[in-house]
A protein has these predicted regions:
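A membrane-interface helix-boundary motif in multi-pass transporters
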Residues: 28, 67, 149-166, 349-373
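Paired small-residue
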Residues: 92-101, 294-302
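A late C-terminal transmembrane helix in Major Facilitator Superfamily
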Residues: 324-357
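Extracytoplasmic gate region of multi-pass secondary transporters
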Residues: 15, 206-247
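Helix-to-loop junctions at the C-terminal end of transmembrane segments
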Residues: 46-67, 256-268, 352
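C-terminal transmembrane helical hairpin of 12-TM major facilitator-type secondary transporters
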Residues: 268-314
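Helix-loop-helix hairpin linking two adjacent transmembrane segments in secondary transporters
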Residues: 90-91, 123, 128-180
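Cytoplasmic helix-loop-helix junction between adjacent transmembrane helices
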Residues: 99-135
Length: 395
């Protein structure tokens, strides 16, 4: 539920509302690209804050200890307030609001992920941690359906921002008791007998490649995730089903997270990560090959299916490689993901500016995104050979 608020509303409500804002004349496509980048820049800033928090706190001993549940609560409240703020008729303030919403999203994501994965590790059920990543999918479905209904009712974007802000507070109230007083997330110690998988070296190079490959996923999906409703309108003008492609993406996210949580993984997660990238690349390819109702629907589903599964597997890899500093390195990986997201929208704006039509610009943007995802998948396959896994006993 917390991730549904922070990600489904705080980050992704902008996507289904973008056509409404364009229709109302309060924004144009180049401005929308930069507004999206402001949110992703905030996401990067929040992730970096999580990354360097242990370093800062170690050098400033007077700072109070970080309380994970309190950070989650603060992020949820900030998300609701900042979403409501987008209804204000102050376009000059919108980039700052979206930036701050990105910071809040990153804080909630990192601390919720660390808390849940730590709890599941203690219960010796790490795969069940993937259930939390159904939250963004549920949030995307709900926000997409709400936006579709508001379009049919001829509401304005300002009304939609108010609705989503109120919805964020309602959902936050439901999950509020879960994050009461509790311990700050800590990496779980291995316990019990048996065997675990470990690569032959846990050096900085391996972690660096993982973070870069994960960052590529941020770039690869963001073009479609930000502009899907606009791309669909350019390809299928007048269709009554245009507003359903985004909820279909969210449904794929939801289902993919459930599937990932039920997989009995006994092999290398990097192989699953490569497969996720290939699936997302295929989703983009379907839309390019068949820009039709069926093509966009199938493409949206394929793009969404591995979306949070990629995050789940990548965060598990981070915990495997750096168990003692999991939260910090989760922040680093999330920061790389944020950099990938930041690059996407300005690239779209650049390609649109140098294309004969919006459709041609979006096509070129999607081709670049697909190529990036394929490159990321190949990186994981290369890592499989560079750092093969071996079984080690744990006690």
């Amino acid at each position: 539920m917390a991730l549904a608020v922070a990600m489904g509303i705080g980050r992704f409500a902008f996507t289904p509302l973008l056509p409404m804002m364009l229709h109302d004349g309060v924004i144009d496509l180049p401005s929308a690209s930069w507004l999206a980048s402001a949110n992703y820049l905030g996401y990067l800033a929040g992730a970096l804050l999580c990354t360097f928090q242990p370093w800062i706190w170690a050098r400033v001993p007077r700072l109070p200890p970080v309380d994970g549940p309190w950070m989650v609560r603060a992020g949820l409240v900030a998300t609701g307030l900042l979403t409501l703020g987008m209804a204000l008729p102050w376009p000059a303030a919108w980039p700052l609001l979206r930036f701050a919403a990105g910071v809040a999203s990153a804080l909630v994501f990192v601390y919720v992920s660390g808390w849940v994965l730590s709890q599941m590790a203690r219960l010796q059920a790490p795969a069940m941690g993937g259930v939390m990543y159904t939250g963004p999918g549920a949030g995307i479905v709900v926000s997409g359906l709400f936006a579709s209904a508001m379009v049919q009712w001829h509401w304005h974007a300002v009304d939609a921002w108010l609705v989503f802000g109120g919805l964020a507070f309602v959902l936050s109230a439901l999950v509020w008791p879960t994050f009461g007083r509790g311990e700050t997330p800590r990496p779980a110690a291995a316990s019990g007998g048996g065997a675990a998988l470990a690569s032959e070296a846990h050096g900085a190079v391996e972690v660096g490649f993982l973070c870069v490959a994960y960052g590529i996923a941020g770039f690869g999906y963001i073009v479609t995730a930000t502009f899907l409703p606009v791309i669909a309108r350019a390809a299928l003008p007048g269709s009554p089903w245009l507003d359903l492609f985004w909820p279909i993406f969210g449904f794929g996210v939801f289902c993919g997270a459930l599937i990932a949580s039920r997989l009995r993984v006994s092999g290398d997660l990097r192989l699953l990560l490569a497969g996720g990238y290939f699936i997302q690349a295929a989703g983009i390819a379907v839309g390019l090959w068949s820009p039709s109702l069926a093509g966009f629907a199938i493409g949206s589903l394929l793009l969404g299916l591995p979306f949070t599964a990629i995050t789940f597997f990548a965060m598990q890899e981070v915990r495997r490689l750096r168990p003692a500093l999991a939260a910090s390195f989760m922040g680093l990986a999330t920061a790389m993901y944020g950099i990938g997201q930041i690059v996407g929208p300005p690239l779209v704006a650049l390609l649109l500016r140098h294309s004969d039509s919006p459709g041609a610009g979006f096509t070129r943007s999607l081709q670049v995104a697909m190529a990036a995802l394929l490159a990321g998948a190949l990186m994981y396959l290369w890592m499989l050979r560079a750092w093969p896994m071996r079984r080690v006993a744990v006690s």
